[in-house]
């Protein structure tokens, strides 16, 4: 269902098996719920619906995917290489019963994903050692395989199509519902999947929004508005592009917005120039903060984050936020989003610019084709 080859899925399973060994466990429970839980789809090929629990057994042929709703089981069986069974009333109870049926339960079991507390208690009540494998799993997602990069390129193309359609829909009288509908259709008509589409709308002359909103509210776009966006469409679960842009509606940017965007472009260029293997996250943070701070502005959104398989390291926070910059070194094959969200210090006006980039030995490679820069529409 995810479109990856058998060889790619086996590569992932072997890599995860090595993480089990490092964690001192022979098996693991990989959990996802409510369309979230990237490890389930990464290892099984099944996009999580209501709930899914993957039993990663000592031998790959013994892996079992437990799916919560009985009517979801048939498609899961058609889509996955692993055995699929109904999860029953409680997925962890079913998993422990299956493991016990093969002999006695192991003394230690690894866990990946946000396992609910009640199910954790069930597990901890029968297994003496419950091992958190989330950090190890995250490390497996940082450097992308050739097939993963290809999927991200496809996600980038779908995202470009969405932003192109969005830009065409931004005109006076259009609601944010209608604009986002146009963006969604552009990628769903090509088989793309939803990921995120955030939109910020405010008047350039009296700004009150500095970062895109996560939910549309029926806001009507007007002449001389400024629109910021953060759009991601996916080729497979967690394989999305990401484009952040700013548009002015029916008029050129005011002096303030022109300055904000010029600073954002300069910050983007400074960070992108440093995207080479061996660069530390602290160096990326310093490059962005120097440009933004010297201009007298700040930011709200994270400046940089890993992407493709989750919201990954390095997550570099906006200037002034009480969050330490991680001690992290870039490696070729990582994919990151550079996204300086430059805003005024009063938080009333802001711009977005940025996109998903591939770290290579030669420097950053663009995966997107949508033009950079502040654009006028409508």
For the regions a language model picked out, list residue spans one by one.
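Active-site neighborhoods and metal-handling regions in enzymes and metal-associated proteins
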Residues: 1-378
């Amino acid at each position: 269902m995810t479109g990856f080859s058998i060889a790619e899925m086996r590569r992932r399973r072997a890599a995860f098996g090595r993480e089990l060994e490092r964690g001192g466990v022979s098996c693991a429970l990989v959990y996802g719920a409510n369309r979230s839980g990237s490890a389930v789809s990464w290892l099984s090929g099944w996009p999580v619906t209501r709930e899914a629990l993957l039993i990663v057994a000592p031998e790959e042929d013994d892996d079992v995917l437990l799916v919560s709703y009985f009517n979801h089981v048939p498609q899961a069986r058609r889509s996955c290489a692993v055995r699929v069974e109904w999860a029953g009333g409680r997925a962890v109870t079913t998993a422990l019963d299956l493991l016990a049926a093969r002999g006695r339960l192991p003394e230690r079991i690894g866990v990946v994903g946000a396992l609910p507390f009640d199910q954790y208690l069930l597990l901890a009540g029968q297994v003496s050692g419950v091992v958190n494998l989330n950090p190890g799993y995250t490390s497996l997602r940082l450097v992308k395989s050739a097939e993963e990069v290809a999927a991200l390129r496809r996600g980038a193309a779908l995202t470009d199509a969405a932003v192109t359609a969005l830009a065409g829909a931004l005109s006076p009288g259009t609601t944010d519902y209608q604009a986002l509908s146009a963006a969604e259709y552009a990628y769903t008509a090509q088989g793309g999947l939803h990921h995120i589409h955030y939109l910020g709308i405010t008047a350039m002359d009296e700004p009150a929004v500095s970062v895109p909103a996560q939910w549309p509210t029926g806001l009507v776009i007007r002449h001389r508005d400024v629109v910021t966006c953060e759009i991601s469409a996916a080729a497979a679960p967690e394989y999305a592009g990401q484009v952040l842009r700013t548009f002015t509606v029916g008029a050129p940017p005011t002096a303030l917005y022109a300055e904000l965007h010029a600073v954002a472009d300069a910050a983007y260029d400074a960070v992108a120039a440093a995207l080479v293997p061996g660069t530390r996250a602290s160096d990326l943070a310093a490059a962005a903060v120097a440009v933004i701070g010297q201009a007298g502005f700040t930011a709200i959104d994270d400046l940089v984050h890993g992407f493709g398989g989750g919201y990954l390291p390095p997550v570099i926070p906006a200037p002034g936020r009480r969050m330490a910059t991680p001690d992290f070194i870039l490696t070729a094959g990582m994919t990151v989003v550079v996204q300086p969200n430059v805003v005024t210090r009063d938080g009333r006006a802001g711009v977005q610019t940025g996109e998903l980039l591939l770290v290579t030995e030669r420097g950053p490679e663009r995966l997107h084709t949508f033009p950079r820069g502040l654009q006028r529409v409508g």
